[in-house]
Amino acid sequence: MRTRVKFCGFTREPDIQIAVALGVDALGFVLYEKSPRYVSAERVAQLCAHVPAFVNIVGLFVNSTVPQITRILSKPPISTIQLHGDESWNFALNVKKIMQRPVIKAVRVNPQTDWDEVAHYLDQLSGVLLDADSSVYGGSGDGFDWGHIPSELRGKIILSGGLSVDNVKNAIDTVAPYAVDVSSGIELSKGVKDAEKMRLFLERVRG
């Protein structure tokens, strides 16, 4: 099975057009106001006006309330919700039930990560994204030791955290994840994508 690819942190329409033309599976938009890659709900709608069918549009939320998520989802064409803050597993399940949309929950990996808990909820949500245990919520460029990931979970998870053109091939050979998610590793600057890095990243994923 091929590895799916999500590019995250878009702020500019030309970057989106390039990513779509290259064949990316999913586009991520950061709806967290404290992020340098933040875009408003209205801006997401504008940016996605010409995104074709079957490209998944993912909205990244950080510690938002259910009413806040509901309000934002009433505007742009977000098809998947990504919870990237300190949300509980039960909150993620509740959002999935209320919104009736796929929900991905991010887990910041550290030596205390409860892998039994991850395994328990992995099949109840639409995806679990593994990221570095950074002080910021995503897009830090920090990585983590893939050796922490139990072998029985590797083919089901979304791998993130410090991925780049230089290491994504090794990541796939080592982990064989369901999908990979990258933001800073394909950028010129925060929110500004590099067309050549996007091309090379996809090329190395798809081999």
Predicted regions, residues:
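Conserved N-terminal beta1-alpha1 strand-loop-helix module at the mouth
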Residues: M1-G207
